[in-house]
Amino acid sequence: MTRTRAALLLFTALATSLGFNLDTEELTAFRVDSAGFGDSVVQYANSWVVVGAPQKITAANQTGGLYQCGYSTGACEPIGLQVPPEAVNMSLGLSLASTTSPSQLLACGPTVHHECGRNMYLTGLCFLLGPTQLTQRLPVSRQECPRQEQDIVFLIDGSGSISSRNFATMMNFVRAVISQFQRPSTQFSLMQFSNKFQTHFTFEEFRRSSNPLSLLASVHQLQGFTYTATAIQNVVHRLFHASYGARRDAAKILIVITDGKKEGDSLDYKDVIPMADAAGIIRYAIGVGLAFQNRNSWKELNDIASKPSQEHIFKVEDFDALKDIQNQLKEKIFAIEGTETTSSSSFELEMAQEGFSAVFTPDGPVLGAVGSFTWSGGAFLYPPNMSPTFINMSQENVDMRDSYLGYSTELALWKGVQSLVLGAPRYQHTGKAVIFTQVSRQWRMKAEVTGTQIGSYFGASLCSVDVDSDGSTDLVLIGAPHYYEQTRGGQVSVCPLPRGWRRWWCDAVLYGEQGHPWGRFGAALTVLGDVNGDKLTDVVIGAPGEEENRGAVYLFHGVLGPSISPSHSQRIAGSQLSSRLQYFGQALSGGQDLTQDGLVDLAVGARGQVLLLRTRPVLWVGVSMQFIPAEIPRSAFECREQVVSEQTLVQSNICLYIDKRSKNLLGSRDLQSSVTLDLALDPGRLSPRATFQETKNRSLSRVRVLGLKAHCENFNLLLPSCVEDSVTPITLRLNFTLVGKPLLAFRNLRPMLAADAQRYFTASLPFEKNCGADHICQDNLGISFSFPGLKSLLVGSNLELNAEVMVWNDGEDSYGTTITFSHPAGLSYRYVAEGQKQGQLRSLHLTCDSAPVGSQGTWSTSCRINHLIFRGGAQITFLATFDVSPKAVLGDRLLLTANVSSENNTPRTSKTTFQLELPVKYAVYTVVSSHEQFTKYLNFSESEEKESHVAMHRYQVNNLGQRDLPVSINFWVPVELNQEAVWMDVEVSHPQNPSLRCSSEKIAPPASDFLAHIQKNPVLDCSIAGCLRFRCDVPSFSVQEELDFTLKGNLSFGWVRQILQKKVSVVSVAEITFDTSVYSQLPGQEAFMRAQTTTVLEKYKVHNPTPLIVGSSIGGLLLLALITAVLYKVGFFKRQYKEMMEEANGQIAPENGTQTPSPPSEK
């Protein structure tokens, strides 16, 4: 048994552990070569780590062992206990518990094997130890074997088929069986049967007899037939009756011995066996002789015996062989003791396994008894000098079978009143935790909470936590180590202790890291104490299955509420400490100072070893920062030119105050730390306005080794003589890190900075203000603006709105001067153009941003004079440009309001606010055009003057703008000239919307000389003709919408003779109109609002073609006769005839078989 100290000196390990409360650099490992060492662990008497080794084999039939391990000696020694010989294989050390007031240790072995007949029971045994000796053994005495009362009847065959010798042998067998059982738990009765029945003694007579075996002396054979069924009926109705001494709660057993099948009996077995079953009689049938080799005889034994028959039948070849089965019969009868009866309580605690869990309470130790009452479970409370009290759910009428109540036990206190919390991880396969409290000296269930996942083992571990250390339990942690998720295994529920008799619920759940689905997070829980110095209790949770059973432990801090932080502050993996560790975190114990440094320690059990981890002392750092002088004088930063000419010196004084935050026994001189100071001027600014004299730049670093005292240092700052921004104070930022120095006297224990300690500090160095003798700046601001060159705003055409703004200050210097514009949402700020300035030392910069104000669609644009002072007597002019949304809705007038304010908090005046209105119209782009499909040309003759022809004009109307609007489409059609109809029955149609209605009205012709006008310009329109005007109103002409209109009527020809023209153009006109007070056509696009369509009308003359046809025909005939005569004269017709004849002769000759010679060719 040796002690191993592991010093992890690697830089990476050191770096990762600096911010953690549990020290992993210097730890103590206790190793013992005993099976199960580390399965349980408990801190004891602020000096020892007590470790259980429940699997250790100490001697024959003895298992388990205890060890006490000391930090100072680094060794483990066995704790010698006088284990009684009856504590067979008890697994001592499987559960451990301790208390400090007074110092007591409870070590339990819950697997004491107790043999009763053929049954092996599991009870428990615990040892209560004081600082020097064993004080008590729990339970005080060994549990005796349960005594089940048994009433046994022998029903023996006395028929004539049995010889007197065999009858005597059978009686000896009966005598031997009776002698194997003890009174008073077992009593016998004897009846002999043939065709007669004789009761030799009853249970009552057996109980009264001083020598029961003497009752067998008067038994003589009856002789006769074999009435077995009737005999069984007599036994059921008579011997197993209370009047014959039968006991109500005793097991009823009937042993029938016969040499053959029943004979002459009027009853059948089916008549009597159901009676025996209803009475709960267990029947054994013993068949003697060769008769039972017959199938029918064997069936009788099956009918007599209880089921299963093979367990209740004995068959021997002769009576001499009965002695061979007497032990078998005995064992079978003994085995009946393990069966349950309706009211028996003898077997309720035979598998109790007391001490499976243990906890100390003010009233005495409590031992979990998970196996009691068919593994329903419960717990025993052992008050001093009093009988134990059994606590379970029997009074709650709840089915708790196989729940393992008492698997874990914990004490809860609320204002001095104690409650007991028991875990039942197998309750309905999901688990449960139950709170018991005393009511009228009876332990009753107060509240319960159940698990949510089958197999999660909710309630396998419990931990009572007093977060705020006020002496009352605030919450109970309930582990469910087998809770399964895809990426992590196990969880711990945080359940506030219910007040009064309210429902118990859990308001949070703690988890381990992801990636460990078999981690068993929550297998072990312990209270560690306040390790980070915030005066709130912290807890540790074990996860022994993580990283392939290497294990890990998690530290969770307490938080106000009170509750537990949902995220862990530290995780220690077993592989981080040693590659050989297995099941690290399977047992935990914390809260005591074993290393004598005033800090609580943590003992962690693993396979074959226990590791002792110390907590580190926690430090707190306070900081103060001052400047000398407290503000920068004006002479140091005011200048009229942007030239750095000289520098001013300012001194900064920084003090650090280091103190202990956690209570410990370490001296002030012992605790030292390496502190790194990182200083920066104007962090976040592109260029600093000051530098350190030491480094000539904006940053500086120093490293100091400091103890628990105040430490101050001075730093000189240099400032340029011309500062661009003298409004915003110069910022000095301090960032420090603290690394504790190892304490050699305490095995290199390192202090640490509190995790929630502030590490960043800032101080501001302001600039002196020019505010007069009273140091209160009273500015006098004013503002006005105009819209240069703009009389009205045309939305959709004017994409920008320019406001020329003038701001002035007639008072003292103004700081943080801001100009705020209030405008509709249709306007959005774009940019400002800086203009003229008067009275300012340096240039001005304006920075603007916009934001909505309220829910009325109003926006606010603020422009800050950045970051300078707006001097008294100064005046600036700038141009603010706003984008105007083409779809903006601004009403008929735009109101723009401007306000000027400052950080001087000077009361507002009429000059600080200015507003101006601007008329608003909305630009539209509507177009009307003539459609290409219309009647372009018509002609007629004089004979058709009284007729007419259908004419059609078509127009297309489009909204090409970005806004819907109501419009009217007007059409002018000439219908009358000098009281004569021109265009008749004219109608307007709109195919896309037949429901659109158009109105019409006649317009009289102007009083003018139409004939003179049309002679100059042969065009008929409404300037000279009477017209019909159509008006079609469109309530909403949508964006990109297209409308088609058709004018159709009968165009007459008769009126044309008035104008003395053969060709004239008939013109219709279409025009778009709208409300010009609201809308305006885009500039330059007005011509597209009007269009016309023209149809040309022409008159023609009709000519007579007869003379021309007759003259042409006669002339043609005369010409043909002349040509024929000429051809005849030249012999044209004769030559042709001769050639035709010769060709005909040439074709006939070959047919007659002779060849006609060719005429000689002419030469």
UniProtKB/Swiss-Prot annotation:
Disulfide bond positions: C69-C76, C108-C126, C116-C145, C495-C506, C639-C722, C655-C712, C771-C777, C848-C863, C998-C1022, C1027-C1032
GO cellular component, one term: integrin complex
Residues the record lists as binding Mg(2+): D157, S159, S161, D259
Matching PROSITE patterns: FG_GAP, INTEGRIN_ALPHA, VWFA
Chain positions of FG-GAP repeats: 23-78, 79-138, 340-391, 392-443, 444-504, 507-565, 570-630
Keywords: Calcium, Cell adhesion, Disulfide bond, Glycoprotein, Integrin, Magnesium, Membrane, Metal-binding, Receptor, Repeat, Signal, Transmembrane, Transmembrane helix
Residues in compartment: Cytoplasmic: 1129-1163
Residue sites binding Ca(2+) 1 per the record: D466, D468, D470, D474
Gene3D superfamilies, per database record: Bicelle-embedded integrin alpha(iib) transmembrane segment, Integrin alpha, N-terminal, Integrin domains. Chain A, domain 2, ntegrin, alpha v. Chain A, domain 3, ntegrin, alpha v. Chain A, domain 4
Alphabetical list of PANTHER family matching this protein: INTEGRIN ALPHA (PTHR23220), INTEGRIN ALPHA-X (PTHR23220:SF118)
Family: Belongs to the integrin alpha chain family.
Subunit details: Heterodimer of an alpha and a beta subunit. Alpha-X associates with beta-2.
Domain comment (free text): The integrin I-domain (insert) is a VWFA domain. Integrins with I-domains do not undergo protease cleavage.
Stated name of the protein: Integrin alpha-X
